[in-house]
Amino acid sequence: MIRRPPRSTQSRSSAASDVYKRQQIMAWFMDEYGMINGHTPGIVTGKPLELGGSLGRNAATGRGTAIIARETADLLNMDLNGARIVIQGFGNVGSFAGNFLNEMGSKIIAVSNVNGGLIDPDGLDIPSLIEHNEKNKTIKGFSQGKAISNDEILNVECDFLIPAALGGVIHKMNVDKLNCKVIIEAANGPVTPPADDILFKKGIHVVPDILTNAGGVTVSYFEWVQNLQQFQWTEDEVNAKLESKMVAAFKEVGNMMTSKDTSMRMAAFAVAIDRVANSFELRGV
């Protein structure tokens, strides 16, 4: 007997926004699917608010990154207040993460985007830089800081390095030049496996992407739930639920890391596999 896979519906699956797939594209996606299948706003997330999007979704990945950085500092007995932070990638994720970390008292000493970067050892004025970037679509021409390239920014001495752009930027050819204590993976796969092994041996703590940037997909889930309920939560409710989820996930991964004496990446994988294995066992599969 041939078993046909079920047709994709908003009760079974939901697409989320990512790099180059912003609100307008998600709105088109929802509209096209809806013309064929009827009103199904939950089929995609990251939509405009007017079309069933969630409050807090735009900032979610950056907010989650800042929460994870804060929890990591606590775990490693580091002081986030005054900590020197470098952010490669000052788009949606990096700019929000930088703003939240700035509000937490951290010193953002260098940032970059596709056009290059800026560095100021005394700390950049992040709110003004965000305003400049939104107005000019570039961080070039900002009144503060010295120009620095995307490659050079990875080598800046700092406490926390946050790669928030594209994958594979830290690899075996440049990993020995890094001068940070902790790497917070806000992008997807910014550290290659060979580089990851080297960092672990050198004692540089890497917080994996599947934990760090989970804030975005978490609030996408919240958006999907709101669509199914046909009820919108307040931004404070969304942010509080996100905080709770991120902190709980970090603690679970941290406990696994400590108990197994392994890297945080391996601990995150172990937690995920344990959950799947337990669900299969309970179902008798």
Predicted regions and their residues:
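Single conserved hydrophobic/aromatic residue that forms the stacking wall/gate
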Residues: 1-16, 20
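Glycine/serine-rich phosphate-binding loop and adjoining beta1-alpha1 elements at the start
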Residues: 14-81
